Amino acid sequence: MRSQPSPGWRDGIDAAPWAPSATRDALRLRAWLNRLVREFFHARQVLEVETPILSAAGNTEPNIDGFQTRFSGHVDAGTPLRWLRTSPEYPLKRLLAAGVGDCYELGRVFRNGEAGGRHNPEFTMLEWYRVGWDHLRLADEAVELVQQALSLVGRNAEVVSTTYRELFVQDAGVDPFTASDEKLQAPLREFGIEGEGLSRDDWLDLLMTHRIQPDFPADRITVVHDWPASQCALAKIRQPVAGSGEPAVAERFELYLGRFELANGYHELTDAAEQRARFLSDNRVRAGRGAVQPPLDEHLLAALAAGLPDCAGVALGIERLLMAMLGTERIAEVLAFDFARA
């Protein structure tokens, strides 16, 4: 997919500060990927929608920080303090509750706190929802989309699907549900991690990012499903059969291409009271860390109370997918202008 640069084009991240951080080829690939995404969902009769980027509510997830801004004009309805969305999830669910059916959005989202390497505060997210599906069926569709994307660069990938428990036992030698905290920490000693204040889930995340994920083969799509209930986020929790001795699990999956985490999907929680409790729990964690506690999304909670249909949803990072397709570790190489050049 080589193309001839136009006169004056400064190609790539090492060019002058005013010039693009991506090559022309990378920008073309992004355009082709956007077209592929839209054709993929058009063929499946999934409706493209656009939802607000500014919201009166923020994301309470303890490990995600949002940007705040203030409207300077006259406002009769609602607070002038607004949040840039970290995902389109909440308004998309409101559309689902209103009866829009299967839908997706391809648009910009914003997350505060990290820039450089694999991260940019502004990036593109693809998020879609399927009514009547669970997380496993949606994972299959996400795999199909990634495989089609790989065809744009003449690549293909084998697919491995595993439970969270199977993955940790096989690749780290520990059972994530029953191992002691000491056993979880043992494989990470060589990294010299300061453990003060880290929770069990933090150690599990570190095992994934430091010991397991780096060994995923570059030409393999790995789907990891049925996560610990403590990492449920906005997913349903499946209780075990009585007397089975099995743990409760979150009906959630993550999808990786090589070492790149691309997508995070849920069999969506539909219970408004439980969702409110999770939001409040998130904000208690944030308060303990001295972090901002965003206002809850009361519109979402009202939509859940009105009736969110049984559905599954997934968010996929477009830049991460492009990076994995091109084999680069720098997000700047797939952005016209990264944060430093914006």
Where would I find each of the regions flagged by the language model?
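TRNA-binding/sensing appendages of the translation machinery
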Residues: 2-70
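Short, charged, low-complexity patches
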Residues: 30, 135-139, 272
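A translation/RNA-centric and nucleic-acid-associated enzymatic feature enriched
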Residues: 36, 51-57, 62-95, 104-131, ...
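Short alpha-helical functional segments enriched in proximate histidine and acidic residues
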Residues: 40-44, 149-152, 214
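Short aromatic/hydrophobic-glycine micro-motifs
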Residues: 46-47, 155, 172-174, 193
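Acidic, low-complexity central loop/insert segments
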Residues: 134-160
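Short, conserved secondary-structure transition motifs
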Residues: 157-175
